[in-house]
Regions:
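Generic alpha-helical hydrophobic packing signal
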Residues: 26, 53, 57-66, 70-73, ...
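N-terminal leader segment of winged-helix/HTH proteins
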Residues: 1-48, 93-95, 112
């Protein structure tokens, strides 16, 4: 137990027989609860019937467009099937379009439509507020620490 305060019990240290395992102390359980809180706040504040994954794809595409679907998936931490479904829905809604890749006309790339750009503009302030509200129980220092720790394990 080098450099560890002995009064702090490790989060996941079940006994071999499992009798000290408590799901509410497990990282997966806590991350799921935090995500549920975030999704509920997001749904209540964001407009345009956007999901968290659609918003992630739109806002990242704004930064990196034009982009292949695979690149957008990597940039938003979505697997191939998930990003395909998200992009298909965004295309169907007229927020994203495909175009010939200017570097290789045989490939298609994704770009925001004017409506996609407008959707981002209408919702960007709400997105910032969603993050602030999600993290509202934390101090500024705790927010920074949480974000750094999450980046470290991702």
């Amino acid at each position: 137990m080098d450099n560890m305060d002995e009064s702090v019990e490790p989060v996941d240290n079940p006994k071999p027989n499992g009798e000290e395992y408590h799901v509410e102390r497990q990282i997966g359980f806590l991350l799921r609860q935090a995500n549920q809180r975030h999704v509920a706040i997001f749904a209540g504040m964001m407009g345009d019937r956007l999901t968290t994954t659609q918003w992630a794809a739109l806002s990242k595409l704004r930064e990196i467009q034009p982009s292949s679907q695979n690149q957008l998936g990597r940039e938003t931490a979505m697997d191939v099937a998930t990003i395909k479904g998200v992009v298909d829905r965004l295309v169907a809604r007229g927020l994203v379009q495909t175009e010939a890749d200017p570097k290789d006309g045989r490939r298609l790339v994704l770009c925001l439509t004017d409506e996609g750009q407008s959707t981002i503009a209408r919702n960007i302030e709400a997105a910032v507020t969603v993050t602030d509200e999600t993290l509202s129980p934390l101090t500024s220092a705790e927010r920074m620490m949480l974000l750094e720790l999450l980046k470290k394990i991702c």
